[in-house]
Amino acid sequence: MSDSKHVTYEDAGVDTAEGGRAVDAIKQMVKDTNRPEVIGGIGGFGGLFSAAALKDMEDPILISGTDGVGTKLVLAQIMDRHETVGQDLVAMCVNDILASGAEPLFFLDYVAIGHIEAGHMAKIIKGVADGCKLAGCALVGGEMAEHPGVMAPADYDLAGFTVGVVDRPKMLDPANVRPGDVILGLPSTGVHSNGYSLVRKVIGVDGIKPGTPEAAAKAEELSRPLEELGGASLADALLAPTRIYVKPILELLRGGAPVHTIAHITGGGITENLNRALADDVDAVVTRNGAEMGWDVPPVITYVSRQAELAPNEACKTFNMGVGLCLIVAPEDEAAVTEALVALGEKPFRVGECVEGSGKVVYSDER
């Protein structure tokens, strides 16, 4: 290039000094997630975690999971509320491996952002650290990737990765599910982290850029209390963090509860997740009467579904419908498992039952 001139990394938009300040800002919150197996601290080329504790298991099976938060982040950016999306990230990963009965051991995060600002980054990572503490796993590493010229300064995306362990004899397996089994549900906090592409259409945030007057006006609108939500605002209801079910479920399983398998209800709703926990010759019959489910649905899900004029089947394959986690148990164990869950502070309810079939989810009002 004949007209070339000296250009630094900072000239290109990457502020390594601010990146260093961001690392300093999160060091203590990361350290606070440590388990005894963690070796060293952040800053190395890899996160170190001792496997010595696995020697007490008969046949330890490592289970990994990775996921993101999706377009819920668009709403967080418009509202300038970043403290809880990290919990969403952790939940999406650890709840997935919990479905096999695995205990999450450690977690890593990846943040892609247009411009790193230490205070902003600390808010995001605080949510990740809080989620790790709720799940009992260590945050052993991560990456902050600044993407100047590719992403707008305030834009960011999150991805996470977790590794857990379960002893093979205790691993949950859909093959254990039989006709007659009962499906129990644990409540969600709301929409959790799936269905936000539809939510964005309903609340009219598509095309609005964070930090603009349009974003400020929309944030004010979404902060108004709504009677349909019991006085809560759409912003509060839609940004409620995804529940992390790890500690009560692991305590339940360690107590010997005879759970056949578990389904984490995420993208695709009940219809496209509960089937993943079924044996090939079993169907799940979910209790429903038209638009009414057999349990209480969070008002925000009902509100969005009505605004979008979703048919019941469409709603059930878009949203969790108030069910964050399903546990499948034998009918003779339903009362004992329910009692144990209540003792752990949970509020279980019956979602449906299993019948002979071909691995599908069907609804009672369509049989």
Language model: regions and residue ranges:
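Short, acidic (Asp/Glu-rich) active-site segment that either coordinates a divalent metal cofactor
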Residues: 66, 157, 170-230, 234, ...
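Hydrophobic alpha-helical scaffolding
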Residues: 12, 16, 80, 189-192, ...
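Glycine-/charge-enriched secondary-structure boundary and capping motifs
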Residues: 2-11, 120, 124-131, 135-138, ...
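Hydrophobic face of alpha-helices
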Residues: 23, 122-125, 196
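Buried hydrophobic packing segments
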Residues: 26, 48, 93-94, 199-202, ...
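Residue-level signature of catalytic and energy-coupling elements of molecular machines
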Residues: 15, 67, 180, 264, ...
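Glycine-rich phosphate/pyrophosphate-binding loop regions near the starts of catalytic domains
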Residues: 28-189, 285
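N-terminal amphipathic/basic leader segments beginning at the initiator methionine
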Residues: 2-37
